[in-house]
Regions:
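Bacterial Sec-dependent N-terminal signal peptides
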Residues: 1-28
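Helix-rich interaction surfaces within compact, conserved domain-sized segments
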Residues: 102-161
């Protein structure tokens, strides 16, 4: 009886190690793909949720994207501070279609993410910072001149999607 239990434990341990190795291989491949996309400086982020200053968290599952391509930032940020009590989301959008003045990318390996800092030409009153995890999850921080920040959560996607 003890031999059967020991045999079962060995089989479970071997299967567990194989599954963990397979998961780490998938994570490594995903991290390499994210690195290539970020370093190309051409990528899109699909916005999935928003967290405003009052810590109101909303899942929006929008079709809105933040696109960085060819030295431009094109974005439509829902639920921004243009109207705090909109009757519909279109009343509170912030649209940006501007050339990028500066774009800095830092690899923060200890945190498992890239930090992308963007300053745009017009409107110059906004600063956009993006944290892109090695797994493709993103946090986008948009700050206006009154220091109000809206945080968007999303997912990195390839630019041609």
């Amino acid at each position: 009886m003890n031999i059967r239990i020991l045999g079962l434990a060995v089989i479970l341990a071997v299967n567990s190690f194989a599954a963990m190795a397979q998961n780490s291989d998938v994570a490594k491949k995903e991290a390499i793909a994210v690195k290539e996309i970020v370093e190309s400086r051409n990528f899109k982020i699909n916005i999935l949720n928003v967290l405003r200053e009052k810590r109101v968290y909303m899942d929006i599952y929008s079709k809105n994207t933040i696109e960085i391509a060819d030295g431009k930032l094109i974005a439509k940020f829902p639920y921004f501070y243009r109207n705090d009590n909109p009757s519909n989301t279109a009343q509170s959008y912030l649209k940006i279609d501007s050339d990028i003045r500066t774009m800095k990318i830092k690899n923060k390996a200890k945190r498992g993410m890239y930090d992308v800092s963007i300053k745009i030409d017009k409107p110059s009153k906004y600063v956009v910072n993006i944290d892109i995890g090695y797994d493709g999850n993103c946090m986008v921080y948009v700050t206006n001149s009154q220091k109000k920040t809206v945080i968007y959560g999303g997912r990195l996607i390839e630019p041609n999607m």
